[in-house]
Amino acid sequence: MIQKYSSRLLEKAIDQFATLPGVGRKTALRLALYLLRQPVENTRQFAAALVDLREHISYCRHCHNISDSDVCTICADPTRDQSTLCVVENIRDVMAIENTSQYRGLYHVLGGVISPMDGIGPGDLQIDSLVHRVASEQIHEVILALSTTMEGDTTNFFLFRKLEPTGVRVSVIARGIAIGDEIEYADEITLGRSILNRTDFSDSVKF
C-alpha cells in the first residue's frame, strides 16, 4: 500500500531516512516528525554534523581507521605499544576492541575479508599495506582478530602465509567468540578475554 503524505517536503525527508540501514518508512516517518518538533537550530546542527562527517572525515594513512587528520589518535599516541598490530575487518571492530580496555597496541583495518562469493579478493583489501608496515616498522606481533566465519578463517590463513616470510609472530584471538560471530557483536568481557588468551596462529591450524 502506497503511503500518501500531506507534504512533499515531509515525503522527501522520509525518502532519505528510509535509505539508512534498518530504517523502514514507518521509522523514517517518526524520525522526520521528531525533527519537526525540535528547535530549528538543533536541526541545523544535526544536518551540519552529517555534512562535516561526509566531507571532512578521513582515513589514517597508517592503519586506515577513521580520523580527523592524516594520522589517527591511536597511531599518534606515544603511549601505545608500537610493536603490536591488531588486524581487524572494519572500523567498528576497532571500537569494539577499544571498549574492552584490554589492548594497548596499534591496529590495521583491512576493510573486509576475502570472500570470492562476494567478489572480494586480496587485492580489494589493505593487505599489501599490512605487509609493508610489518616489514618497515618494528612490529613484533600481529594479532589476527577477524570474524569467526569461513571468510574470516580464509583471510587469517592468507595473512599468515603472507606474513610468514617476515618472521613476525602471528597470533589469533582465542575462540571465546562463537563460530560465525562477528567481532563487533561480541560482549566486552568475552572479547577482552579472547585477546588476552590469544595463541600462535600456527598452533591453531593443521597444515
Curated annotation (Swiss-Prot):
Ion transport listed as a keyword: no
Zinc finger motifs (C4-type), residue ranges: 60-75
PROSITE patterns: RECR (PS01300), TOPRIM (PS50880)
CDD domains: TOPRIM_recR
GO biological process: DNA recombination; DNA repair
InterPro entries: DNA_Rcmb_RecR, Rcmb_RecR, Rcmb_RecR_Znf, TOPRIM_dom, TOPRIM_RecR
Protein name per its UniProtKB record: Recombination protein RecR
Species for this entry: Porphyromonas gingivalis (strain ATCC BAA-308 / W83)
Lineage, opening ranks: Bacteria, Pseudomonadati, Bacteroidota, Bacteroidia, Bacteroidales
